[in-house]
């Protein structure tokens, strides 16, 4: 990692996790295997901020711990990449085990339980699916009917929010905005 930490992917320690490494990595990992429109990739860091905006809209507001869980919901991808769902299914449990271990270490590092409660996971999943719908139809060339079948209904967001979050940012912008959201949530 750029911080100098060495993270054991098979036995990750919360002590080897730094938010700067997560932000840097996620800002450079492409969603949709990079198959999106725009001058820049649509990064996992930008995706997590879109998921946050959707969750806030869907729930009428969320507390800081839930918002932190949302921000970090794809954090393991800073070191293992964003593998597309069909390929995850082919690889099976081995990938899930590594991902869950990393997620647990990341959560512990930032004061969250290793495994999120079911109600929190449902909120994250609903907002994540909504983000996938918007990304698929606005950035990745999916037809609306096709996206409905995969991701469920389109979430309601103000046009200005959609325009901001669905215009791929440069990696530096995604990293800065991800870190700014982390600081706002943790008061660090």
Annotate each PLM feature:
Residues 1-188:
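Metal-dependent phosphohydrolase cores
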């Amino acid at each position: 990692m750029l911080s100098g930490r060495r993270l054991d992917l098979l036995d990750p320690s919360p002590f080897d996790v730094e938010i700067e490494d997560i932000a840097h990595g996620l800002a450079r990992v492409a969603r949709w295997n990079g198959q999106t429109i725009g001058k820049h990739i649509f990064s996992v860091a930008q995706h997590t901020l879109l998921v946050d905006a959707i969750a806030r809209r869907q729930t009428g507001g969320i507390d800081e711990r839930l918002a932190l869980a949302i921000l970090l919901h794809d954090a393991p991808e800073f070191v293992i990449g964003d593998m597309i769902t069909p390929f995850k299914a082919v690889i099976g449990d081995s990938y899930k085990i590594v991902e869950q271990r990393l997620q647990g270490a990341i959560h512990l590092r930032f004061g969250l339980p290793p495994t999120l409660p079911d109600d929190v996971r449902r909120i994250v999943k609903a907002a994540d699916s909504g983000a996938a719908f918007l990304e698929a139809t606005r950035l990745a060339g999916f037809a609306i009917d096709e996206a409905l079948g995969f991701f469920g209904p389109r979430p309601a967001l103000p046009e200005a929010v959609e325009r901001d979050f669905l215009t791929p940012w440069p990696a530096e912008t995604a990293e800065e905005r991800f870190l700014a959201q982390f600081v706002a949530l943790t008061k660090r």
